[in-house]
Amino acid sequence: MSSNSDTGDLQESLKHGLTPIGAGLPDRHGSPIPARGRLVMLPKVETEALGLARSHGEQGQMPENMQVSQFKMVNYSYDEDLEELCPVCGDKVSGYHYGLLTCESCKGFFKRTVQNNKRYTCIENQNCQIDKTQRKRCPYCRFQKCLSVGMKLEAVRADRMRGGRNKFGPMYKRDRALKQQKKALIRANGLKLEAMSQVIQAMPSDLTISSAIQNIHSASKGLPLNHAALPPTDYDRSPFVTSPISMTMPPHGSLQGYQTYGHFPSRAIKSEYPDPYTSSPESIMGYSYMDSYQTSSPASIPHLILELLKCEPDEPQVQAKIMAYLQQEQANRSKHEKLSTFGLMCKMADQTLFSIVEWARSSIFFRELKVDDQMKLLQNCWSELLILDHIYRQVVHGKEGSIFLVTGQQVDYSIIASQAGATLNNLMSHAQELVAKLRSLQFDQREFVCLKFLVLFSLDVKNLENFQLVEGVQEQVNAALLDYTMCNYPQQTEKFGQLLLRLPEIRAISMQAEEYLYYKHLNGDVPYNNLLIEMLHAKRA
């Protein structure tokens, strides 16, 4: 911040748990934007003991054994980076034993315990750390961990003869095939994600859209407005204040899948999941995007992805809130003050951004971060999240030759294209090309939520206090997405890589959108008390 007073205001806000986005940032004339009460405020987030066990501490830091390296697919060595580690103790695995890959030591321990019907007790609190160096200290906790990661009691022979009950053969065969696919994919693709730097420089002189699009206004009049049933969504209501639709998440410790993703070093952060998932279909209800490619059962969805789905907002409720807000905006204006179509679109995008911020602040992992890190991540990716949200809406709901709005209305694409300026037309064209690519890939809801988290937890953001957590989330989500695509789309061997290659395209479109929005803002077409502009100023500061 440029002045002592601005810094003092910001520090005072932080003391009370609130930080204005864009406060003290310069406007187009170089003057600081005051920290008005109408700006979005972020609450001071205290780190919860969320359980990638209890070792995050006050700083929200990840435990040492989860300090993972940045996810890259350049020069990936299968032997080094995809080497299997025992899920019980972290030692090198020797093969499939009693339901999953384990080391020789844990195999023998599990077999002796079951065959001899041993009963152990723990002299501590039944949460002893089990690793290669101290796996023999507490047999009780070691055996419990064997069971929790999926070793099967029924696979041990009761007659003490060598060799287990080989009823898991098909599962082992499938798991081996999956690993070979991973190895081939990683070696073949050699992906390196780089953000595209091409941004169209030409700015349009003006934007006028045909009155045919004005059906947005008339359609909104037909929707019954029930303010009692809808929480307020205006600028005086911060999306960082708990609302009736805020999501609640169980502690990490209760999530079975995290034992695979979050408890071991980076080379073990892979979702092999030899046994079926326990999550029920009801655990992913509440999200209305029903994609055409929904063929996978919960048994083939990594547990981490199921938890990401739980963070998703209720789309009909978001749609109703935005429509109610637009109704109220129009009702409060006289005939001569009615919003232009462009102004209406800006309000629509602005309210969509509010819902995205609400989603982020209630999401798993993100809420573990301190306020400063949350602000930096959101300021970095807000436009990408908006574009991704729009793109996915078109993939799922859009019809050929039309644009599907967040309010649930279809607008003729050709009308917008014929009336828009050069830059907006180009931007829309690129967006439609991306929609077509994702449709051809059969882009689905599970992949959508993974990409959202990959965009939000960007490794490009500098000066993060808890970069290790961001890095860990990137690797976990990448691993879950890889497993999901391999398991559910085996015929599309390159799908994982193709999805990742869409991220630079989303970044390029978002950069174009930011430039266009800033141009319209300089022309006075977008008001200051707008979250889009506050975010834009914060990113450019």
Curated annotation (Swiss-Prot):
Tissue: Abundantly expressed in pancreas, less in liver, very low levels in heart and lung. Expressed in the Hep-G2 cell line. Isoform 1 and isoform 2 seem to be present in fetal and adult liver and Hep-G2 cells.
Matching Pfam families: Hormone_recep, zf-C4
Location in or out of the cell: Nucleus; Chromosome
Motif (FTZ-F1 box): 168-187
Region spans: C-terminal extension (CTE): 152-167
PTM info: Sumoylated by SUMO1 at Lys-270 during the hepatic acute phase response, leading to promote interaction with GPS2 and prevent N-Cor corepressor complex dissociation.
GO CC annotation: chromatin; cytoplasm; nucleoplasm; nucleus; RNA polymerase II transcription regulator complex
Domain topic, free-text comment: The C-terminal extension (CTE) loop competes with a DNA minor groove anchor of the nucleosome and releases entry-exit site DNA, thereby promoting opening of closed chromatin.
Descriptive protein name: Nuclear receptor subfamily 5 group A member 2
Organism the protein comes from: Homo sapiens
Organism taxonomic ancestry: Eukaryota, Metazoa, Chordata, Craniata, Vertebrata
